[in-house]
C-alpha cells in the first residue's frame, strides 16, 4: 500500500527509532552494503540500449558472463550466503546448477518448494557455517528469519525499495 494512502487512513507516520539506533544497541546486526556495478563492453551496451525494459531484464538474467561472475563472487564469500533471484527457470535454476558444483552445501528454494522443506533448509543453514541458499525473491525476501546469514547477493535487478529492504532484513 502506498505511503500517502496509509497516512490518509491513519495519520502521519511516527518513527520510534531508526535502524542505526537499533544497530548501535545490538538489536539489529550491523551491516555493510557493497554495490558492485558490472562494466559491459560498448557493443553490448549499445545493443541493450535499444531493448525494452523486459527484454533488457531477460538479457541480464540470461547473460552467461554475468552469471559466471555471480558464481565466482558467491564462491569467494565466506559464511552462509543467500542468493536471491526473480525468475526460476531462466535464472534461478541455472545459478543453482552452477553453484551446486562448488564444494559447499547448496539449497534451491522457490515457490514450488514445500513449506516444510523451506523450514528444513532454514534450520539446516542456521547450523551451518558456509552454506548457500539460492532462493526466489517471493519465497525468501519477506517473512523468513535466518539467524546465521552472513551475505545476501541480489542476482536479479529490482527497483522495489521495499523488497530490497525486506530482503536485507533476513
Where are these regions (language model features)?
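Conserved SF2 helicase motif VI
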Residues: 159-170
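Post-DEXD/H (motif II) to motif III coupling segment of the RecA-like Helicase ATP-binding lobe
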Residues: 1-34
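Short, well-ordered beta-strand core segments
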Residues: 13, 81, 133, 152-153
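Short glycine/proline-enriched coil/turn segments at helix->beta-strand junctions
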Residues: 11, 75-80, 100-105, 129-130, ...
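Conserved helicase ATPase core of P-loop NTP-dependent helicases/translocases
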Residues: 82, 91-94, 104-141
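Conserved catalytic network of the ASCE P-loop NTPase/AAA+ motor domain
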Residues: 27-29, 75-76, 123-129, 144-146
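Conserved P-loop NTPase
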Residues: 29-49
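Conserved interdomain hinge at the start of the Helicase C-terminal
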Residues: 45-86, 90-101
Amino acid at each position: 500500500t502506498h505511503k500517502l494512502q496509509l497516512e490518509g487512513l491513519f495519520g502521519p507516520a511516527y518513527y520510534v527509532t531508526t535502524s542505526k539506533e537499533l544497530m548501535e544497541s545490538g538489536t539489529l546486526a550491523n551491516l555493510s552494503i557493497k554495490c558492485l556495478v558490472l562494466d559491459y563492453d560498448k557493443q553490448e551496451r549499445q545493443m541493450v540500449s535499444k531493448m525494452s525494459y523486459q527484454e533488457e531484464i531477460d538479457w541480464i538474467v540470461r547473460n552467461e558472463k554475468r552469471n559466471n561472475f555471480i558464481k565466482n563472487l558467491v564462491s569467494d564469500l565466506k559464511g552462509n550466503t543467500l542468493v536471491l533471484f526473480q525468475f526460476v527457470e531462466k535464472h534461478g535454476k541455472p545459478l543453482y546448477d552452477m553453484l551446486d558444483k562448488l564444494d559447499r552445501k547448496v539449497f534451491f528454494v522457490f515457490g514450488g518448494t514445500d513449506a516444510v522443506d523451506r523450514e528444513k533448509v532454514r534450520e539446516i543453514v542456521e547450523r551451518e557455517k558456509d552454506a548457500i541458499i539460492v532462493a526466489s525473491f517471493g519465497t525468501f525476501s519477506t517473512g523468513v528469519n535466518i539467524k546465521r546469514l552472513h551475505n545476501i547477493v541480489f542476482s536479479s535487478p529490482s527497483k522495489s525499495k521495499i523488497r530490497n529492504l525486506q530482503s536485507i532484513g533476513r
